[in-house]
Amino acid sequence: MKKRMLALAAMSLALALALAGCGGDSKAAQEATEIEEAMAVDGLAIPVAELTAEPSFIDWEQDGIAMQLLALVNDDGEVQLAYNTCQSCAGSPYAYFEYANGMLICQNCGNRFGLDSVGRVAGGCNPKPVSDYSEDGDAIVIPTSELASVAPAFKTWKKF
């Protein structure tokens, strides 16, 4: 447990330093926070302290496939998680969402999706919910098996 807390603290510091160097040059339409590095602990660990009511875009590589997740904290203090891939447009290189004016917008079909449903609505033109994760107080942990099961949906992705 002590090693895990030290790793969590080190990664949080690295993340804070990385985020401090970001800014100024971001796309105007992309109003959300981008968490560029998350911690690896037999999967992906996302520091809860870094999340806000605006969606964070979390980059991850699984089995050589670049992926991205959305994470935010709602008004009730609950974490909402989803993969940044459109379930209806899956297979399209543009089946991902960008955030603008309080909405997530599918870059393939243009559907607008409200933040209140992130991670809660399955099926349709919306981000795919993360089905297996745990909270350990300081971080949300998504196991490698969960990430590996969804990675194929990102194979044709053109966001990166």
What are these regions (language model features)?
Residues 100-109, 120-131:
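Short cysteine/histidine-rich metal-coordination sites, predominantly Zn2+-binding motifs
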